[in-house]
């Protein structure tokens, strides 16, 4: 239509959302019904106070047009990435070197884990940061730098945006006992 500076509802329907692509590097989106179409991602998602809360990034749509499901990177995550670009000229994603998934009631019961939420580790890659820190398959990471983790995707997003070579502290459960790296 050739119109600029438009506003849509942009109701937030979920936080910590995944687009469904497990291979994607970022999985902690804000889900909104803002009218985002192919080619106009990158615009701001703002709250009622006019504060930036996210950067519109992706949509789920069979046609490529607005279907009422859009995703935004939270502004605090975007800020971290911008700082890396300023400092290094590129984004350098942190990596633990683990595979895993969300801790759910069935998984907790199967492995005898006394936790309701966290990041379940199914595999630790040899010589990775996780391996060097002593993490093992079956551990459940419950905190990152003293902040509770609710899911594997949250851990993945926070590690990815923490930057390379940064020291972090992980709290985890192993055999019913709490430990820290």
Model-predicted segments: where are they?
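Conserved catalytic motifs of ABC-family nucleotide-binding domains
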Residues: 138
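Serine-dependent protease modules
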Residues: 1-133, 143-167, 173-178
């Amino acid at each position: 239509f050739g119109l600029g500076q438009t506003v849509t509802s942009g109701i937030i329907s979920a936080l910590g959302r995944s687009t469904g692509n497990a291979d994607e590097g970022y999985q902690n989106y804000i889900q909104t019904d803002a009218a985002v179409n192919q080619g106009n991602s990158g615009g701001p998602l703002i709250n009622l106070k006019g504060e930036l809360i996210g950067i519109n990034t992706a949509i789920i749509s069979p046609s490529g047009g607005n279907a009422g499901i859009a995703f935004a990177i939270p502004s605090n995550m975007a800020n971290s990435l911008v700082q890396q670009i300023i400092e290094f000229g590129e984004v350098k994603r942190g990596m633990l070197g683990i595979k895993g998934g969300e801790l759910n009631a069935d998984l907790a019961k199967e492995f005898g884990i006394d936790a309701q939420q966290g990041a379940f580790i199914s595999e630790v890659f040899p010589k990775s940061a996780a391996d060097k820190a002593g993490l093992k398959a079956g551990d459940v990471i419950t905190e990152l730098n003293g902040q509770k983790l609710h899911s594997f995707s949250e851990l993945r997003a926070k590690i990815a945006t923490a930057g390379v070579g940064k020291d972090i502290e992980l709290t985890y459960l192993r055999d019913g006992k709490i430990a820290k790296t």
